[in-house]
Amino acid sequence: MKFSVNQKDLQESLSFCQNVIERRSTLPILSNVLLEASGKELIITATDLDMIFVHRIQSVEIEKEGKTTTNSLIMYDIVRKFISGKKINVESLSENKMQLESEKSKFKLNCIDPQEFPLMEEGFEAEEISLDSQSFLKLLNKCKFSISNDETRHYLSGIFLHFTSGDDKNFLTAVSTCLLYTSPSPR
């Protein structure tokens, strides 16, 4: 794998990954991001087994396709210290080493075999939903009071998002042991 990418694009993607990855995991692969250079895009994936984050960077120059995983936090710390807006060259040196290079700086990072990275296959690319972020945030803020904080009842600590096609009967629901909140969606 060998590609060049803009520093800002890579930093933005890796900063989103920091909210998903596990820092103190018993599985080292969960602290890593999957980097996949294929076609005309770089696909960056992070997961903690409960949620998955996938970001595609289109403005990338790929010399050699491939994929690898490396520690997300270490890579993010390196990338954010590179000069903003400059090109970063990324290359797999071997199965367990990769190199980041920008201007006069070179860093070698340890990698883990990408086959070990846990990907949730079923229904992953099923459907895309677009919502106005401000309206969605308002709905989440209205709904969060009724989410249970009881760790013994983890099945009550989430929000159910229901979207139907065509009839505009979309809603969010949150429930705790004594509260129920249902709201129409901002579609």
What role is predicted for each listed range?
Residues 1-183:
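Structural preference for solvent-exposed beta-strand-turn elements
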Residues 185-187:
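Positively charged, low-complexity/disordered segments
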